[in-house]
Amino acid sequence: MNNPMIKNGLLLALFALLCTGLVAVVNQQTFDKIKLQQQKELMGILHQLIPEEIHDNELTAQCTLLQNKEALGTEDAMPAYIATAAGKPVAIAMEAIAPDGYNGNIKLIVGINTQGEVLGVRTLAHQETPGLGDKIELRKSDWVTKFVGKVLKSEDDKQWQVQKDGGDFDQFTGATITPRAYVKAVKRAVWYFTQHQAEIFSQPLNCEAKHD
């Protein structure tokens, strides 16, 4: 142990170990802060979509994973947050993907009550062109609010299209692809929910398994 080279090697190894541990701690703390912030943002969005006066449960605690590529636009399992009152389901907020946006996937979430009425829609993530396709963001435009109160009468309800295609929804000047993809994605999610309510509400609450 009196060999200087051995001592220096041990000191370097100890220093490296301490640095690695410090980096791991900092990374974990950063991850926890990011996760907490994301959770707060999600809570805010869920409360925008599903009014607090119609449910008495914590939405993020009652979450199930749905998997249906045709309806949700992805092969991945997507979270769905169930609102209940006195233990009975009253509404749901489902995440879905519009896979055919102008610049790729658009991630959105749609709130629907058990009568099939849309309570609200919000955009969670997208890469659409600033100044054109980004009007799907509430902070840029109130376009997404046009879904509120809508009911899908049938799977091929012609009203659920942009006006250019004969429907009720405005298209954007110079950007028809984005709203067309968005309307189709919301329509698919709403139809899926209205046709599979009982099945969805009977699924296990398993969203934590996805995040572990």
UniProtKB/Swiss-Prot annotation:
The protein's required cofactors: FMN
Ranges annotated as spanning the membrane: 9-29
Annotated keywords: Cell inner membrane, Cell membrane, Electron transport, Flavoprotein, FMN, Membrane, Phosphoprotein, Translocase, Transmembrane, Transmembrane helix, Transport
EC number: 7.-.-.-
Chief place where the protein resides: membrane
Subcellular location: Cell inner membrane
Residues with PTM FMN phosphoryl threonine: 176
Superkingdom: Bacteria
Gene Ontology terms, MF aspect: electron transfer activity; FMN binding; oxidoreductase activity, acting on NAD(P)H
InterPro entries for the chain: FMN-bd, Ion_transpt_RnfG/RsxG
Any one GO CC term of the record: plasma membrane
GO biological process: electron transport chain
Membrane-topology descriptor: Single-pass membrane protein
Record's signal peptide: none
Family of the protein in this entry: Belongs to the RnfG family.
Free-text function comment from the UniProt entry: Part of a membrane-bound complex that couples electron transfer with translocation of ions across the membrane.
Assembly mode: The complex is composed of six subunits: RnfA, RnfB, RnfC, RnfD, RnfE and RnfG.
This protein's name: Ion-translocating oxidoreductase complex subunit G
Organism from which the protein derives: Shewanella oneidensis (strain ATCC 700550 / JCM 31522 / CIP 106686 / LMG 19005 / NCIMB 14063 / MR-1)
Species lineage: Bacteria, Pseudomonadati, Pseudomonadota, Gammaproteobacteria, Alteromonadales
